[in-house]
Amino acid sequence: MAKMLKLWRLVLLAAFSLLLMAARMPDMKVVPWQQVEVPTQNILLDIAFTGTNPSHGWLVGDKATLLESQDGGLHWQVRKLTALEPEAYLSSISFAGAEGWVVGQPRILLHTLNEGSDWTSIRLSKQLPGEPILIQALGPGAAEMVTNVGAIYRTEDGGQTWHAQVEEPIGAIKNIARGPGGEYLAVSSRGSFYFLYTPESRSWKPYPRESSRRIQNMGFGPNGSAWKLNQGAEIAFTSDFTSGEWSKPLRPGRALSFGYLNAAYQNDHDLWVVGGGGTLIHSPDGGKTWEEAKKLSNIPANFYSIEFFGPDRGFILGQRGTLLRYVGYSNSPS
């Protein structure tokens, strides 16, 4: 009897060990990302390149951070604007052609017509609900701006007048993403709800969280799909972002890990997710299997944002002036 119990203990121990091994994501053999030195230790929040010169890029961040690159993001220089207070929080930048926009707090709106050679500060009304957090350039003189309470405004005259696109704001939000057709997914400040806006509805539709864990961030994927990151390193997917129906949340990798903060599709199937403690994971098949860039966990920074400007051009932004550039597998030294 004692021998039988000992045998069962060994079997259970082996099974438990296999479960632990399965829970660990494999390490990426080649990490196609390289860190770029930037002349700041501030948090980097958004990146954009001009529509007239794809090598001419801009970075924005907290503490009035404004950086410029002329070589596609390899090297960056500080740009100082006297119109900005030292503690200005620049959260979003967007270009359409040579025309660009920057928004931030407190009530910051910057505008350029010449790729950023000159920036003009545009005064925003004190009646504006909330603070600007997102800007999208749409064409000559046209842009769409969103505030941190879900108010959406559009201009067609270079920012002189703005017209409301939504009937009522939704209250404090912590993250928002814009879809290719002008749709928005917004996460409530507490992560208990998310909201969907479509241009034809002119209103926000609320959806409660389906998981016991609060929602951290959301974004759009290819062909009408979307992803959702929950606290506790959970990921869920939907093939139709208008349906309100999501897959069962999964937790790639270890049971204990840093939280996931943002995600981006490189193409229709390659998905990258970033998070705290230098976390970067990759799925080559839309979320079925995963691998981890463990070597990047040595970078002492949280990764807040990831964005691709085409399948071969991507950037990761984070705290302490952290910037990574996608270099591809053939150019990676790892």
Swiss-Prot record:
One GO CC term, this protein: photosystem II
Signal peptide: 1-22
Repeat among keywords: no
Location relative to the cell: Cellular thylakoid lumen
Alphabetical GO biological process terms: photosynthesis
Keywords assigned: Photosynthesis, Photosystem II, Signal, Thylakoid
Domain notes: A 7-bladed beta-propeller torus, about 55 by 55 Angstroms, with a depth of about 25 Angstroms and a central pore.
Family to which this protein belongs: Belongs to the Ycf48 family.
Subunit structure: Part of early PSII assembly complexes which includes D1 (psbA) and PsbI; not found in mature PSII. Binds to the lumenal side of PSII complexes. Interacts with YidC.
Function: A factor required for optimal assembly of photosystem II (PSII), acting in the early stages of PSII assembly. Also plays a role in replacement of photodamaged D1 (psbA). Assists YidC in synthesis of chlorophyll-binding proteins.
Name assigned to this protein: Photosystem II assembly protein Ycf48
Organism in which the protein naturally occurs: Synechococcus sp. (strain JA-3-3Ab)
